[in-house]
Amino acid sequence: MSLHRLILSLLVAVGLSSCAIVPGDGGQGETTRWTMLMVSPKDDVADCHLIRLPDGRKVLIDAGKLGDSPGAALAAVQAQNITALDLVILSHFHIDHYGALWDLIEAGITIKRVAINVPVQAAADQEKGWGCNLDHVRATLKKLDDHHIPYFTPKTGERILETTTAQGTVVALDVICLYDGLNSPIGLTDVNETSMIVRLSHGSTRALFTGDLGGRLGAYLATSNFDLKADILKVPHHGSEGCAPNEFFDRVGAKAVLVPAPKNLWASGRSMRIRNYFIEHHIPTYVSALRGNVTAVLTATDFRIESER
């Protein structure tokens, strides 16, 4: 291994890619801000992403809850001075992606609507005792009903939110695809493969949210006709093995990636393939446990990345 590659490998392994220079806003006016909230301070994994739109609306993608830091998501959201959310998107029903929704509601944060994708019984039953708990999912939906919070399941290709800036730039959230765990192009899947794939666009600048997209569906999408191109990628499955294959990353073609992962997991062998891919492709990599809150600032033609450390 050359000295250059060795240095680059070490930098990406700790989430400090030497290619961290990214485009700026270029004076493009209003911005959309996506903050990957740091909710993995110990060893458990979770996802929680806050989007602030130019018109003032706020969206949360996932609200994960961890066994070793159960209050992390609520604390992170409250630290952003959030009292109301116009939309919450739950990518899929694993507790590390939706468990803190209860906490947000009980803390008095107003939630206007929730986008969900409940897996079929056959998919959930494969994970009894360790993965998706449909009884808890039903209890969560009842909690939404009890608090008069509407929820819905979008369709593939549906635009679930749109606004236009003063400069005439369209900002939107689009559902690229979602499957229920049975009616999919690869048949019966696990619950990770029911992850709602969502694209945030601000003009021509794009960010792709992938939940815990796994290897089988990821391989299918890599050869599909879906438009997966994005400037910034939320790496699926906390950047660990079992996530989408390298061919999926090729299709996305991201210029920067955000990884919601604890430090030990990212440094482990479980993340080696993913780490090495971004090293070899010289893609700036931002890991939440190492960089704290990481914010992607999107403009009509560009983006920049900011982090706490």
Give the positions of each predicted feature.
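Core dinuclear metal-dependent hydrolase active-site scaffold
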Residues: 21-84, 145-229, 292-309
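Active-site metal-binding motif and surrounding structural segment of the metallo-beta-lactamase
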Residues: 54-59, 67-122, 223-240, 253-258
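Active-site HxH/HxHxD metal-binding segment of metal-dependent hydrolases
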Residues: 96-146, 150-151, 270
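Active-site environment of divalent metal-dependent phosphoester hydrolases
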Residues: 45, 66-68, 93-99, 121-124, ...
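Internal alpha/beta domain cores that form substrate/cofactor-binding pockets in large enzymes
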Residues: 230-252, 257-295
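C-terminal motif of bacterial Sec signal peptides marking the signal peptidase cleavage site
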Residues: 17-18
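Extracytoplasmic/secreted envelope proteins and their assembly/folding machinery
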Residues: 48, 70-74, 98-102, 134-141, ...
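Bacterial N-terminal signal peptides that target proteins for export
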Residues: 1-8
